[in-house]
């Protein structure tokens, strides 16, 4: 059995730990922080807002928030991080000062009206480009009044931005979404003293009566990153894998459950349950069958590109529907998946809200074809999840990715661990 501690700290928790520390008034410690480009953007913005950040150990920081957030004399650069832009928008909406949030070309083309509308419901003064659809965003911090909001989309980023504004508003606010999204924000903030209640899917958020409690938080491994190696095991004959110290929040393991429904042998072993469930995941290769994914999309939206690779190895036609939000990620991920598969000669079809893929029962035929002619270069579209998903396919096919370096956005150790998996699995270790 291959045993991997993937050393890929959870991206969602790393962002939130930094941003939430700014609502405390005492130093906070974040251990095992994800040193990916996205999370480092959140850390740099915290510094630009006046926080003191000290490196106290490998991948560990002490963050001392300022008494009041500083109005920066420059644009707050989120680079490629949608989480940074959306959560900081909620935080800064009630802070004194003028704040401008911008990013790279990819981020500035992603939809931002989805957070501007709920923040404006509080009375927030926030503007975006092209009639509030896109960044850069300009925020003039101002007093907020409580509101009730029903979101048309299930998005943890939208929900988190709303909560951060609600904590600074006057009165009790409520938030409802049409499908459960990741709940790390609620869990973390409640543990730090925020009054957030969930009744039948409706969140009630009361304003903070005092600053959040200081914390010392160690971040577990990211299940979204771990999933790439669960996928590696699922498509590699005779392989068995143990993934250690993985965050097992129920809103984060839907992709593992989908892979399990496809036939992979997957078991969880919970090792601790303090703030969040953390444990190990056991995976064993087994023949895969086709799957239809149409529900709980918000809980596996990031893993759908990787699941598309599993679908290629499955018997039958697999389908993804109700996933239109894939078109609004770092790339149009529906188009990215389908165009790469079609370039490889794989039968697939693109829909407005998803795609279908006809699985190959015998991948060796495709491998033989590419032994006779050079396969097309896989296009990452500079999207880390597209690049890593198709990199897993190199376990079975002699492919090259045009820009695997973009994996550093969320998973700096990816290339090293993939090479390690190849070495151990093909050596029968």
Swiss-Prot record:
UniProt-listed Enzyme Commission number(s): 2.5.1.19
Keywords per UniProt: Amino-acid biosynthesis, Aromatic amino acid biosynthesis, Cytoplasm, Transferase
InterPro entries xrefs: Enolpyruvate_Tfrase_dom, Enolpyruvate_Tfrase_sf, EPSP_synthase, EPSP_synthase_CS, RNA3'P_cycl/enolpyr_Trfase_a/b
Coiled coil: none
Active site, renumbered: 302
CDD domains, sorted: EPSP_synthase (cd01556)
Record pathway: Metabolic intermediate biosynthesis; chorismate biosynthesis; chorismate from D-erythrose 4-phosphate and phosphoenolpyruvate: step 6/7
Iron among keywords: no
Locations listed in the record: Cytoplasm
Binding site for 3-phosphoshikimate: 11-12, 16, 155, 157, 302, 329
Pfam families attached to this UniProt entry: EPSP_synthase
Amino-acid positions noted as binding phosphoenolpyruvate in the UniProt annotation, renumbered to this chain: 11, 82, 110, 157, 333, 385
GO cellular component terms given for this protein: cytoplasm
One Gene Ontology molecular-function label: 3-phosphoshikimate 1-carboxyvinyltransferase activity
BP GO annotations: amino acid biosynthetic process; aromatic amino acid family biosynthetic process; chorismate biosynthetic process
PROSITE patterns cross-referenced by the UniProt entry: EPSP_SYNTHASE_1 (PS00104), EPSP_SYNTHASE_2 (PS00885)
Top-level EC class as recorded in UniProt: transferase
Chief location of this protein within or outside the cell: cytoplasm
Catalysis: reaction(s): 3-phosphoshikimate + phosphoenolpyruvate = 5-O-(1-carboxyvinyl)-3-phosphoshikimate + phosphate
Its job: Catalyzes the transfer of the enolpyruvyl moiety of phosphoenolpyruvate (PEP) to the 5-hydroxyl of shikimate-3-phosphate (S3P) to produce enolpyruvyl shikimate-3-phosphate and inorganic phosphate.
Subunit structure: Monomer.
Protein family membership: Belongs to the EPSP synthase family.
Protein name: 3-phosphoshikimate 1-carboxyvinyltransferase
């Amino acid at each position: 059995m291959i045993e991997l501690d993937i050393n890929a700290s959870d991206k969602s928790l790393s962002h939130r730990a930094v941003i939430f520390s700014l609502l405390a008034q005492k130093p906070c410690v974040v251990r095992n922080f994800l040193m990916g480009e996205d999370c480092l953007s959140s850390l740099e913005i915290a510094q630009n807002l006046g926080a003191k950040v000290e490196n106290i150990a490998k991948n560990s920081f002490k963050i001392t928030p300022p008494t009041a957030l500083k109005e920066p004399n420059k644009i707050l650069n989120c680079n490629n991080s949608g989480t940074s832009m959306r959560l900081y928008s909620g935080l800064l909406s009630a802070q004194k000062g003028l704040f401008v949030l911008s990013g790279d070309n990819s981020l500035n083309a992603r939809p931002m009206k989805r957070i501007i509308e709920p923040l404006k419901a509080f009375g927030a003064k926030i503007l975006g480009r092209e009639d509030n659809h896109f960044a850069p965003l300009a925020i003039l911090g101002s007093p907020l009044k409580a509101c009730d909001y029903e979101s048309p989309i299930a998005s943890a980023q939208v929900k988190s931005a709303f909560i951060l504004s609600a904590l600074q508003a006057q009165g009790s606010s409520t938030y409802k979404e049409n499908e459960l999204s990741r709940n790390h924000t609620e869990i973390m903030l409640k543990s730090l003293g925020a009054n957030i209640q969930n009744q039948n899917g409706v969140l009630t958020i009361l304003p903070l009566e005092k600053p959040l409690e200081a914390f010392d938080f160690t971040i577990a491994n990211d299940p979204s990153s771990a999933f790439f190696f669960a996928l590696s095991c699922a498509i590699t004959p005779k392989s068995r894998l143990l993934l250690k110290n993985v965050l097992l929040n129920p809103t984060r393991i839907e992709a593992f459950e989908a892979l399990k429904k496809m036939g992979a042998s997957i078991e969880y072993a919970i090792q601790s349950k303090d703030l969040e469930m953390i444990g190990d995941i056991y995976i064993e290769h087994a023949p895969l069958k086709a799957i239809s994914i149409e529900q709980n999309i918000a809980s596996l939206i990031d893993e759908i590109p990787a699941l598309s690779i599993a679908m290629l190895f499955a018997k039958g036609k697999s389908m993804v529907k109700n996933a239109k939000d894939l078109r609004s990620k770092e790339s149009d991920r529906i188009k990215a998946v389908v165009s790469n598969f079609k370039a490889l000669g794989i039968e697939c079809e693109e829909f407005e809200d998803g795609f279908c893929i006809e699985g190959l029962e015998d991948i060796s035929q495709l491998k033989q074809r590419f032994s006779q002619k050079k396969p097309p270069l896989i296009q990452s579209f500079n999207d880390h999840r597209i690049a890593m998903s198709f990199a897993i396919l190199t376990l079975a096919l002699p492919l090259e990715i045009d820009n695997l370096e973009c994996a550093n956005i969320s998973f700096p150790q990816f290339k090293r661990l993939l090479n390690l998996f190849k070495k151990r699995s093909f050596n029968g270790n």
